[in-house]
């Protein structure tokens, strides 16, 4: 009987010792989010292609987009359906140019002005570069950020806009949005990304 008690006590001590040395499982959505943010911000070269649906109180439209980001410079190709026209947006620290398929070429210090001129819609292009990847944009304060259990953004409020992430994909081991809704008042943009490509 005494030997049995000693054996049980020894096993219990062994189990407790093993439990004490095992690392705590990391299942913190905020930690996962911060890890993804660091990796995504370090990824300065990327491509994304998909579609955008634009809506106001009394109008709606859609276009396809091809976004090519290389450091601080970018090229975005916009195409309206049924041959209604296309444009290329080229931007960087010096400003932004927009060239249309009709041969028009316009310059502005920010992309929002040019996209509004071409499409007639308000689109937060400068912030979209970050929101597309599930990141907050530098500058304006983040008013709200909700994460899902996997540490991915569900809802982001920034610069007066609300970004709701509806679906996600995985590219090079990184979570990247597949579908997101962006809205401010009666203006809204739904973006669906078909393909992501990250530089190795």
Swiss-Prot record:
Q: Which InterPro entries match?
A: LolA/LolB/LppX, OM_lipoprot_LolB
One GO cellular component term, please give it: cell outer membrane
Cellular localization per UniProt: Cell outer membrane
Its keywords, alphabetically, are: Cell outer membrane, Chaperone, Lipoprotein, Membrane, Palmitate, Protein transport, Signal, Transport
Quote the Gene3D superfamilies the UniProt record gives: Lipoprotein localisation LolA/LolB/LppX
* Keyword check for Protein transport: yes
Covalent lipidation (S-diacylglycerol cysteine), chain numbering: 19
- Describe the subunit structure: Monomer.
NCBIfam families on file? lolB
Family label: Belongs to the LolB family.
**Role noted for this protein:** Plays a critical role in the incorporation of lipoproteins in the outer membrane after they are released by the LolA protein.
Q: Give the protein's recorded name.
A: Outer-membrane lipoprotein LolB
Q: Which organism is it from?
A: Alkalilimnicola ehrlichii (strain ATCC BAA-1101 / DSM 17681 / MLHE-1)
Tell me the gene name: lolB
């Amino acid at each position: 009987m005494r030997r049995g008690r000693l054996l049980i006590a020894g096993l219990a001590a062994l189990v407790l010792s093993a439990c004490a040395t095992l690392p705590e499982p990391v299942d913190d959505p905020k930690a996962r989010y911060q890890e993804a943010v660091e990796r995504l911000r370090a990824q300065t070269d990327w491509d994304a292609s998909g579609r955008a649906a634009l809506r106001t109180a009394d109008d709606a439209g859609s276009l396809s987009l091809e976004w090519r980001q290389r450091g601080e410079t970018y090229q975005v190709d916009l195409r309206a359906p049924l041959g209604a026209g296309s444009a290329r947006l080229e931007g960087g620290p010096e400003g932004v140019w927009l060239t249309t398929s009709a041969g028009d070429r316009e310059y502005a210090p920010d992309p929002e002005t040019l996209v509004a001129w071409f499409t007639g819609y308000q689109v937060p292009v400068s912030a979209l570069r970050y929101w597309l990847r599930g990141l907050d944009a530098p500058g304006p304060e983040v008013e709200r950020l909700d994460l899902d259990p996997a540490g991915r953004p569900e809802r982001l409020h920034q610069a007066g806009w609300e970004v709701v992430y509806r679906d996600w994909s995985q590219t090079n081991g990184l979570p990247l949005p597949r579908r997101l809704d962006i809205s401010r008042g009666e203006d809204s943009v739904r973006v669906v990304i078909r393909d992501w490509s990250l530089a190795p």
